[in-house]
Curated annotation (Swiss-Prot):
The gene is groES. This is Co-chaperonin GroES. One of its GO terms (molecular function) is unfolded protein binding. Belongs to the GroES chaperonin family. Together with the chaperonin GroEL, plays an essential role in assisting protein folding. The GroEL-GroES system forms a nano-cage that allows encapsulation of the non-native substrate proteins and provides a physical environment optimized to promote and accelerate protein folding. GroES binds to the apical surface of the GroEL ring, thereby capping the opening of the GroEL channel. GO terms for biological process: chaperone cofactor-dependent protein refolding. Keywords: Chaperone, Cytoplasm, Stress response. Gene3D superfamilies: GroES chaperonin. One of its GO terms (cellular component) is cytoplasm. It is found in: Cytoplasm. The keyword Transmembrane does not apply.
Length: 96
C-alpha cells in the first residue's frame, strides 16, 4: 500500500530506541521511552497560505528529524509498519 500526505503533513518512521541503559541494564516494558526522532518518508505539497499560494515544506524525504509527539501526531500501521503522520509545525529540528 502507498500513502501520500496532503498539504503540510509529514509522514515519519520512528527511529528505534536503545533497549539498554548507559549502565548496560536491559530496559523493558514501561521503562522504555519512545523516541522522538524519525526519518521522513513522505511530505505533502506544502502549507496553503492566506493569499492562496503554497509554501513548500522545509523538510524532505530522507531527513532525520526531532519531533514533538503531541496531540496532533497520528499513529497508523501501514503494511505492518508503524508510521506517524504530523504537521510540519510539530517538527522541532532536522538532524544533520
Amino acid at each position: 500500500m502507498s500513502i501520500r500526505p496532503l498539504h503540510d503533513k509529514v509522514i515519519l518512521k520512528r527511529e528505534e530506541v536503545e533497549t539498554c541503559s548507559a549502565g548496560g541494564i536491559v530496559l523493558t516494558g514501561s521503562a522504555t521511552v519512545k523516541s522522538t526522532r524519525g526519518k521522513v518518508i513522505a511530505v505533502g505539497t506544502g502549507r496553503l497560505l492566506e493569499n492562496g499560494s503554497i509554501q513548500p515544506l522545509s523538510v524532505k524525504e530522507g531527513d532525520m528529524v526531532i519531533f514533538n509527539e503531541g496531540y496532533g501526531a497520528k499513529v497508523e500501521k501501514i503494511d505492518g509498519e508503524e508510521i506517524l503522520i504530523l504537521s510540519e509545525n510539530d517538527i522541532l529540528a532536522i538532524v544533520e
